[in-house]
C-alpha cells in the first residue's frame, strides 16, 4: 500500500534536486497535506494575481496555503453605490407594476353569475337568444326606403337578372339572397292578388247576369198581366 510513495521510478526531481513528492509515511499522525504542499504552492504561485478589474488586488497571494482566501468586499462591485441604486430602481419598478396589476384586476373583475353576451355570439335576425329547440330564422325587416325601391323595381320587372340583382343589392345594402327571396315572396303575393281579383270579377259578372235575367223576367211578367 505504501509502494506508491516509496517507488523510486515514480518520483521526479527538480533542478535543485528536491523531490516534488517526497516520501512521507502514511502512518505518521502529524501529516497535514495542506502544510506539506504549502512551500511548493507558494514557490510556484507566488505573487499571482488576477488582472480582471472585478477582482480585488491583493499582494502575496499564496495558493495551497493553510489559511482561507480572503475575498475583497468590492470583488463583484467596483462602486459601492451601484447596489443601493439598483435596489431603489427595482423597488420603484415593482411598486408601479403592482399598482398597474391591481388596477387591471379591478377593471376586469365581474360578478360570476353575469355572462356578457357579445354581438358576434348572437344569431343574425334571431327572435331568441341561444340555441334552443326552436332554431327558425327570424323575418328580415326592410326599411321603408328599401321596400319602396323594391316595389318600384317589381312594378317594372317581375323577374330580375343576376346582374340587376347585384346592382340592387349594392344600392340597398342587402345581399343577393335577400333580394331573391323578397322577389319570390312578392311574386307569390301578386299571384294571390291576381287570382282573387279574377275570382271577384267572375262572381261579379255572374251576379250581374243574374240580376239582368231577373229584370227581364219581371218585365215579361208585367206585359203578360196587361195582356
Curated annotation (Swiss-Prot):
Gene Ontology BP, a term: anterior/posterior pattern specification
Chain segments carrying region Disordered: 200-227
Superkingdom per UniProt: Eukaryota
Skewed-composition ranges (Basic and acidic residues): 211-227
Transmembrane domains' residue ranges: none
GO cellular component: nucleus
Gene Ontology terms for molecular function: DNA-binding transcription factor activity, RNA polymerase II-specific; RNA polymerase II cis-regulatory region sequence-specific DNA binding
Alphabetically ordered keywords of this record: Developmental protein, DNA-binding, Homeobox, Nucleus, Transcription, Transcription regulation
Main location: nucleus
Keyword Transmembrane helix: no
Coiled-coil region(s): none
InterPro entries cross-referenced by the UniProt entry: Antp_homeobox, HD, HD_metazoa, Homeobox_Antennapedia_CS, Homeobox_CS, Homeodomain-like_sf
Transcription keyword on record: yes
UniProt cross-references to Pfam families, sorted A to Z: Homeodomain
Motif, Antp-type hexapeptide: chain positions: 117-122
Cell compartment(s), UniProt: Nucleus
Family membership noted in the UniProt record: Belongs to the Antp homeobox family.
General function of this protein: Sequence-specific transcription factor which is part of a developmental regulatory system that provides cells with specific positional identities on the anterior-posterior axis.
Protein name per UniProt: Homeobox protein Hox-C6b
Protein's organism: Danio rerio (Zebrafish)
Annotated gene: hoxc6b
Amino acid at each position: 500500500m505504501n509502494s506508491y510513495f516509496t517507488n523510486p521510478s515514480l518520483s521526479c526531481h527538480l533542478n535543485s534536486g528536491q523531490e516534488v513528492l517526497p516520501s512521507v509515511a502514511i502512518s505518521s499522525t502529524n501529516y497535514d497535506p495542506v502544510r506539506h504542499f504549502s512551500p511548493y504552492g507558494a514557490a510556484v504561485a507566488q505573487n499571482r494575481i488576477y488582472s480582471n478589474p472585478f477582482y480585488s488586488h491583493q499582494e502575496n497571494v499564496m495558493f495551497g496555503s493553510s489559511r482561507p482566501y480572503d475575498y475583497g468586499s468590492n470583488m463583484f462591485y467596483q462602486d459601492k453605490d451601484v447596489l443601493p441604486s439598483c435596489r431603489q430602481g427595482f423597488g420603484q419598478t415593482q411598486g408601479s407594476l403592482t399598482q398597474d396589476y391591481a388596477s387591471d384586476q379591478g377593471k376586469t373583475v365581474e360578478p360570476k353569475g353575469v355572462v356578457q353576451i357579445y354581438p358576434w355570439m348572437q344569431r343574425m335576425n334571431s327572435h331568441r337568444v341561444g340555441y334552443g329547440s326552436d332554431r327558425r330564422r327570424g323575418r328580415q325587416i326592410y326599411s321603408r326606403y328599401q321596400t319602396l325601391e323594391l316595389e318600384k323595381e317589381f312594378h317594372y320587372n317581375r323577374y330580375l337578372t343576376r346582374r340587376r340583382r347585384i346592382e340592387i343589392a349594392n344600392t340597398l345594402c342587402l345581399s343577393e339572397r335577400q333580394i331573391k327571396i323578397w322577389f319570390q315572396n312578392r311574386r307569390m303575393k301578386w299571384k294571390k292578388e291576381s287570382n282573387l281579383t279574377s275570382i271577384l270579377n267572375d262572381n261579379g259578372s255572374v251576379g250581374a247576369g243574374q240580376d239582368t235575367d231577373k229584370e227581364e223576367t219581371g218585365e215579361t211578367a208585367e206585359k203578360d198581366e196587361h195582356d
